[in-house]
Amino acid sequence: MTIKREMRNDKRTAPKAPINENISAREVRLIGADGEQIGIVSIDEALRIADEAKLDLVEISADAQPPVCKVMDYGKHLFEKKKQANEAKKNQKQIQIKEIKFRPGTEEGDYQVKLRNLVRFLSDGDKAKISLRFRGREMAHQELGMELLKRVETDLAEYGTVEQHPKMEGRQLMMVIAPKKKK
């Protein structure tokens, strides 16, 4: 025996405001199409005013006494709200954490290249995670790793601030630097 499931739209939509004949109140506080207060009128009168203007009657605040309704083009209103939400979403900046891996014996040339990449990450507004991995007997000389991370910290002082100070996690020494706030 197979069980049929109803197809449903999985998009999460905000609850729509009651419009026109779906408004259940008998009296409403009416706001005109251009924003002027018309006052408290019966629902029939409000629907007539909206119909004459060839617009919709939309319930703005249902919990007010009496409910507040506005005469507006509901389709245009939904479009504007969706457009504003998309604009706000587009303007959000996702902060990423970029990682650069060092070794206790990182040579000067490699150090400068990695430092240049760290400067670029911080300038772009991303956080930088610096990890220093120890192998084998290098674990006996953890102070070399600490010195290297202190050097990175001083070299990047003008670009960022230390968010997480160096700490050991297993065989790795980790540090996180956040970009400085732009004024």
UniProtKB/Swiss-Prot annotation:
InterPro entries documented for this protein: T_IF-3_C_sf, T_IF-3_N_sf, Translation_initiation_fac_3, Translation_initiation_fac_3_C, Translation_initiation_fac_3_N
Keywords carried by this UniProt record: Cytoplasm, Initiation factor, Protein biosynthesis
Location(s), subcellular: Cytoplasm
GO molecular function: ribosome binding; translation initiation factor activity
UniProt-listed Pfam families: IF3_C, IF3_N
Predominant subcellular localization, coarse grouping: cytoplasm
Highest rank taxon of the organism: Bacteria
GO CC annotation terms, alphabetical: cytosol; membrane
Biological process according to GO: ribosome disassembly
Paired cysteines (S-S): none
Quaternary structure and interacting proteins, as annotated: Monomer.
Protein function: IF-3 binds to the 30S ribosomal subunit and shifts the equilibrium between 70S ribosomes and their 50S and 30S subunits in favor of the free subunits, thus enhancing the availability of 30S subunits on which protein synthesis initiation begins.
Similarity comment: Belongs to the IF-3 family.
Protein name, entry field: Translation initiation factor IF-3
Species this protein is from: Pseudomonas entomophila (strain L48)
Phylogenetic placement of the source organism: Bacteria, Pseudomonadati, Pseudomonadota, Gammaproteobacteria, Pseudomonadales
Gene coding for it: infC
